[in-house]
Amino acid sequence: MTLIVILNDERCLENHHRIDHNYFGERPVYGSNGAETMRVGTSQQAYSSSNTVIENNLFERCSGEVEVISIKSSDNIIRNNTLLECEGVVALRHGDRNTVNDNLFIGNGRRNTGGIRVVNAGHQIYDNVLVGLAGTRFFSALGVMDAVPNSLPNRYCQVVDVKMYRNTFVDCTNIEFGTGKDMERTLAPEKVSFTDNIIINKGLDQPYIAVDDVAGIQFKDNKVQLAKNYSAPGFTTEKVKAPQLPDDAAIRKDKGASWFKNQVAHPAANVHKEYNVSPGTNLSEVIHSAEPGGVIILAKGTYPIQRAMFIDKPLTIRAADAANKPLVRFNGDKPDNMVTIADGGKMVIENITFDGVLEPGKALAKAGISTAFDMIQPYTLIVDGCEFQNFGEGGFFAIKGTKATFAESVTIRNCLFRDLSGDAINYAAEKDDIGRYNADDMLIENCSFYRLLGLPINIYRGGSDESTAGPYITIRHCTFVDCCNKERGSVMRLIGPQVLTVENCNFDNSGRGGATIRLDEATWEKVRIANCNLWNSGRMMTTTSQAIQGKMYNFRPAYINAEAYDYTPVEGSELEKLSIGLKKK
């Protein structure tokens, strides 16, 4: 939380605070609830009047969670603010009689950029301009919520007596009525008016999405310009002119302290200085002394390390020759990771073998690549063409995100994981079931997994919190051979992904005692499992019936050279024709 108006004392009520001409700068996705940029009140003070005015502020890329400005009290005014590329909304979350007017929302098509979300009664929303917002559902340009019957104050009270007029929506993906409808939220909005609004979007056939009954909404005198003529009560197709937006200088004028440059900084490109390293060199010292953006090139050979290679800056570590992978082996006296990513770390690692075999008289490596504890900054990780082998303890993993750490993106491709007792890829440390998760964007592509006792892929986002949009998970063209056949085991354990694609994967003699895929998803989450092959493998277990799409296959795989761990399908085989399993590199 950046700024809170606290109302926990009678003297705090009807405060008539003014929050104006401030600059709220970039805030990255947090991966959990509690990352609002501004909040006025709490659910316990929802029906108390704050009378706070929030005006003439600039919010730029404030994307901590879905609620950029969270209103949880009554009789507030939010006006003349600009939200620029914020992945979130102004949320009238609790409280009545709030006013949102003359604000400018600019998304520039950025994912999850949103506008205004409406809960509770008596609000007025007018003269706002919303342009290029790409968010859906809770991140919509306009989301008018369904409510919970007989709701507790901290849940969802019915939208009643809300007036929305003279707003302009240009190239916004989603205007939605009945947002959040499910088995709990079943009360549609009532006594709501949507009048004199303009909607321009040549990519849409209809102006809004009705998630629930809209009988309680009066549509009147709205003008639309869509992909084709649209005629419905309250809407007419007319040629309308999009509003002229202010230029960048005008948006930033008089926002923030006079001495502060109120613009998201674009860091200068790092100089990619190269460091050529031979076996026998102390890798930890090379990494410590390397400049940010440096490229550490390892010659063929074995690199024993006694403690973790500590990555707290942008670095690339790669093999000098991809065909002759350097081998990193742990021989420390105390268990440690081979690589630890810390605050400031952005790592690319290519064509390296991590061998977890136990050295006589030495400790085991806890992980090939993992993170420090309690990181503040998000990190990024790209692992390409690497091998992870011989990690012999069940609690020690090849790649792992630890609790209280968060990755903006993790990309793992063209890798081999073999002979592991623990998980291969584990981003499942946040098990408090409050919506936290360890990585926002994950891509796992063209990887092989052979002879694993643990889970090849384990990703967890527990609970029912709806303040975030991730994780976004894509798993494609992977092959799993002799993996996790124990009772109640899973090849993939995917709990709570909000956007998921699993496609073109091959399961060979895997998950027999449990499942190939164990997916726990909500009805509204965008999940898709398609074009996979299951040979002598377990079933797919999902919470809803919507995840598995299209045909699944049951062909005996034939590989180019399984003895050398090359699980690419033989040319001309059924899997190769169907583009299932590994792609040729």
Model-predicted segments: where are they?
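Beta-solenoid repeat scaffold
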Residues: 295, 304-332, 340-352, 382-384, ...
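C-terminal amphipathic "assembly/sorting" segment characterized by alternating charged
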Residues: 198-274, 284, 295, 304-311, ...
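C-terminal accessory segments
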Residues: 156, 226, 230-260, 270, ...
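Acidic Gly/Asp/Thr-rich repetitive segments characteristic of extracellular carbohydrate-active
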Residues: 267-305, 567, 572-584
